[in-house]
Amino acid sequence: MARYIGPKAKLSRREGTDLFLKSARRSLADKCKLDSKPGQHGRTSGARTSDYGTQLREKQKVKRIYGVLERQFRRYFAEADRRKGNTGENLLQLLESRLDNVVYRMGFGSTRAEARQLVSHKSITVNGVVANVPSQQVKAGDIVAIREKAKKQARIVEALSLAEQGGMPSWVAVDAKKFEGTFKQMPERADIAGDINESLIVELYSR
């Protein structure tokens, strides 16, 4: 499956906000002009963006935040639309309960890309079973842990230390000494951090 491997800062500048693709705890705001589009001089056109363009940009932004490609994103939206409740909130819950995102939220990876790599390299277990599919859906009560062979990796230790300092989301409980965490429940919309307007995505797919 193809994935973007170019400069991460360029993606954040394209969306005009820090997508935290380089580090979960360190903002890009001090390193580059997020309000300036990528390119030698940035985008200078003052043309107003259409409603469709705004909706499309929001979808692209969310795809980049979670590292999901178009076909997969469409499947998530279709599933979110089938479920009871608010479609936009359902969509974010599906994305947040991906295994790679849960590993990231528990602080085992400093970015979602790093967390995805840990899963792909079989460094993660779910309920004691090795898991290597980043898109695996984690359920309430599932225990996600770092395998013994990976516990001494410096990047994991450092990421976990930074996450402890910054605080964990309320919907996960992490035992840093054991390198494991429990997915307590699906996050409520208010618990999901980030500059995301999911209603724009719902409007886009409702056209």
Swiss-Prot record:
The keyword Acetylation does not apply. One of its GO terms (molecular function) is structural constituent of ribosome. InterPro entries: Ribosomal_uS4 (IPR022801), Ribosomal_uS4_bac-type (IPR005709), Ribosomal_uS4_CS (IPR018079), Ribosomal_uS4_N (IPR001912), S4_RNA-bd (IPR002942), S4_RNA-bd_sf (IPR036986). Residues 42-53 have a biased composition (Polar residues). The keyword Transcription does not apply. One of its GO terms (cellular component) is small ribosomal subunit. Keywords: Ribonucleoprotein, Ribosomal protein, RNA-binding, rRNA-binding. GO terms for biological process: ribosomal small subunit biogenesis; translation. Residues 31-55 are annotated as: Disordered. Residues 97-160 form the S4 RNA-binding domain. It holds the Pfam family Ribosomal_S4. HAMAP family: Ribosomal_uS4_B (MF_01306_B). One of the primary rRNA binding proteins, it binds directly to 16S rRNA where it nucleates assembly of the body of the 30S subunit. Part of the 30S ribosomal subunit. Contacts protein S5. The interaction surface between S4 and S5 is involved in control of translational fidelity. Belongs to the universal ribosomal protein uS4 family. This is Small ribosomal subunit protein uS4. It comes from Burkholderia ambifaria (strain ATCC BAA-244 / DSM 16087 / CCUG 44356 / LMG 19182 / AMMD) (Burkholderia cepacia (strain AMMD)).
